[in-house]
Regions:
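C-terminal outer-membrane beta-barrel translocator/porin domains of Gram-negative envelope proteins
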Residues: 13-18, 22-30, 34-135, 140-146, ...
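Short glycine-rich, acidic/polar surface loops and turns
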Residues: 127-129, 163-169
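Small/polar glycine-rich anion-binding or flexible loop at a beta-alpha turn
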Residues: 144-147, 158-163, 182-184
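Outer-membrane beta-barrel translocator/channel fold
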Residues: 89-105, 178-204
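Flexible, surface-exposed loop regions and adjacent strand-edge segments
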Residues: 7-12, 64-67, 100-108, 157-163, ...
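Short Gly/Pro-enriched loop/turn and capping motifs at secondary-structure junctions
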Residues: 135, 147-151, 173-175, 185-188
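Outer-membrane beta-barrel "beta-signal"
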Residues: 26, 107, 166-180, 196-210
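Short, small-residue-biased leader/transition segments that mark boundaries at the very start
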Residues: 2-5
Length: 210
């Protein structure tokens, strides 16, 4: 829960340190055919990134690696309409500090869950979004997505969480939108009695979620 994440005693009792230093070495590969990076109407974006966090580089009693993959696809449909798809994966090997676990939720993915409500060593999230311009600078969007975090246990479809929502867009500059979203999280993990409450959130920022 949120209380557990912010409670220093909880983190300490779990065997972790609430204060940790993390630095890494890494490399990445990227492929990008989007017409506009911050508000694409067509194209593909792929990014794969691998990082290594060795103890000798100053990490707090840790040696771990992290791999992330992003795949985004954009396609024009009819006049003023754009279909957008996003897939994101985050995998960690070794023993990361609490702060470096993959986090579900936030402003970009699984909107409706606050960032970090669910975290573990492995994460997969995906979403589709329909963006429709309705009049001059005004537009609307709707999305649905799903995701899951897991650790030493295996991936289980019945632990998948879902997010859906809608939003308003105002184009204050050419291809630059103000974003107002309202996202809902479907009921939490039904296998955990403390986690059955529906989550929701208003999100206000500039640029698209992906």
């Amino acid at each position: 829960s949120e209380m557990c994440i912010r409670d220093r005693n909880y983190i300490t009792e779990s065997g972790d340190n609430p204060n940790a230093f993390n630095t890494s070495l890494g490399l990445f590969a990227q492929y990008d055919t989007r017409d506009v990076t911050f508000n694409a109407s067509r194209g593909i974006f792929i990014k794969a990134e691998a990082k290594w966090y060795p103890e000798w580089l100053g990490n707090t009693r840790r040696n771990f690696g992290r791999f992330t993959l992003t795949f985004d696809f954009y396609q024009k449909l009819w006049k003023g309409a754009i279909f957008a798809y996003d897939l994101y994966a985050d995998f960690t090997a070794g023993t990361p500090s609490w702060h470096m676990y993959a986090k579900m939720g936030g402003m970009e993915r699984m909107r409706g869950y606050y960032e970090g409500r669910y975290r573990d060593k492995r994460l997969v999230e995906t979403q589709i979004e329909l963006r429709q311009k309705i009049y001059r600078r005004h537009g609307v969007v709707a999305w649905i997505g799903g995701g899951q975090v897991w650790g030493t246990d295996k991936f289980r479809w019945d632990n998948t969480l879902y997010s859906f929502g809608c939003g308003y867009r105002f184009e204050f500059k050419n291809r630059m939108n103000i974003r107002l979203d309202y996202g809902w999280g479907v009921y939490g993990n039904q296998n955990l009695p403390w986690d059955r409450k529906r989550s929701s959130a208003f999100l206000f920022t500039a640029s698209e979620a992906f």
